[in-house]
């Protein structure tokens, strides 16, 4: 993977780094030392002008605050994950059909289903004798089943010939 790390397109296709805790080997993890990562630097309660009650114990708390009081979003806000159209997927500019909200429309065909076009009333009322399955329709369905799921069809040619 190190050989492709120089490629900017490969880096663009990776999910964005979620900076929890220490973001560099030299940081302690108490603060977020990379304000250029897309969110403002964490300022804490004192700089935001709000007061908090004194801790009940003398040991410092290890809870991670996932919000910044002075920002609209939290410390980590990714539009693909937290946005209004959040599917959990990263939109990739090189595969536009796989984007969460794609501008590429699904292809529409003149005949969506040729089987339904040839037999329009087959599934309307199965108890109607006019809709009973004909032999060529059954042959088409067996052909489809044999192609799609490579199993022995229910009525094979050798059994029908006996």
Curated annotation (Swiss-Prot):
Activity dependence on pH, as recorded: Optimum pH is 6.5 with allantoate as substrate, and 8 with ureidoglycolate as substrate.
Gene Ontology molecular function terms on file: allantoicase activity
Pathway, per record: Nitrogen metabolism; (S)-allantoin degradation; (S)-ureidoglycolate from allantoate (aminidohydrolase route): step 1/1
Keyword vocabulary terms for this entry: Hydrolase, Purine metabolism
Summary of the tissues where the protein is detected: Expressed in zygote.
One GO term (biological process): allantoin catabolic process
Subunit description: Homohexamer.
Function: Catalyzes the degradation of allantoate to (-)-ureidoglycolate and (+)-ureidoglycolate to glyoxylate.
Protein name per its UniProtKB record: Allantoicase
């Amino acid at each position: 993977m190190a050989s492709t790390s120089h490629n900017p397109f490969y880096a663009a296709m990776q999910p964005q780094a979620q900076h929890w805790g220490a973001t560099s080997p030299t940081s302690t993890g108490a603060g977020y030392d990379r304000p250029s990562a897309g969110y403002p630097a964490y300022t804490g309660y004192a700089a935001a002008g709000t007061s908090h009650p004194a801790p009940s114990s003398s040991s410092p708390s290890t809870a991670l605050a996932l919000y910044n009081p002075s920002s609209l979003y939290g410390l980590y806000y990714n539009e693909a994950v937290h946005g209004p159209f959040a599917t959990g997927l990263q939109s990739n500019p090189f595969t536009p059909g796989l984007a969460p909200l794609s501008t590429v429309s699904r292809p529409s065909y003149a005949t969506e289903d040729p089987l339904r076009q040839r037999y329009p009333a087959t599934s309307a009322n199965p108890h109607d004798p006019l809709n009973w399955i004909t032999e060529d329709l059954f042959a088409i369905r067996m052909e489809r089943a044999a192609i799609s799921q490579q199993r022995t069809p229910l009525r094979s040619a050798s059994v029908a010939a006996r």
